[in-house]
From Swiss-Prot:
<protein>
    <recommendedName>
        <fullName>Uncharacterized protein EP152R</fullName>
    </recommendedName>
</protein>
<keyword id="KW-0732">Signal</keyword>
<dbReference type="GO" id="GO:0044423">
    <property type="term" value="C:virion component"/>
</dbReference>
<feature type="signal peptide">
    <location>
        <begin position="1"/>
        <end position="24"/>
    </location>
</feature>
<keyword id="KW-0946">Virion</keyword>
<comment type="similarity">
    <text>Belongs to the asfivirus EP152R family.</text>
</comment>
Amino acid sequence: MYYSIIIACLVLLLCLVIYVGHRADHALKYLEGMWHGDPVFLKQSGLQSFYLYIQPGHTCFFSIVNKNGEKLMETKIPCTITNKIYMFFKPIFEFHVVMAHTYSYFPKQFNFLLDSTEGKLILENNHVIYAVLYKDNFATALGKTVKKYIT
């Protein structure tokens, strides 16, 4: 009797571990693709555009243009993305990012806060928000289609 309760608890615990791991892997895969700046955030920041493309293998391509049309940053930066944390009561994942090279606009280390239900990505460090981005599913799908035909 007691053994069956213990076995049932272990099976439930195993299912929970597998579920959380699967959700974290899904979030890491969802992180890949094209992200663009929120219009309200861009206006408040004095920017015309902010694009981030995260390719598989986690190389980040940043393109930032100010309101005068001047390119502030247009570069490819290798990023190390680690520490998948799932917030149980909110569908938010936190990824710790370390960039190999950096510009004065970003710290060398920051966090991606990903809400996959809203398609929103927040770049922040120590509660300072550097960007609010939304997933561009069309550009992401187009990039995957082009890559498929090139290779």
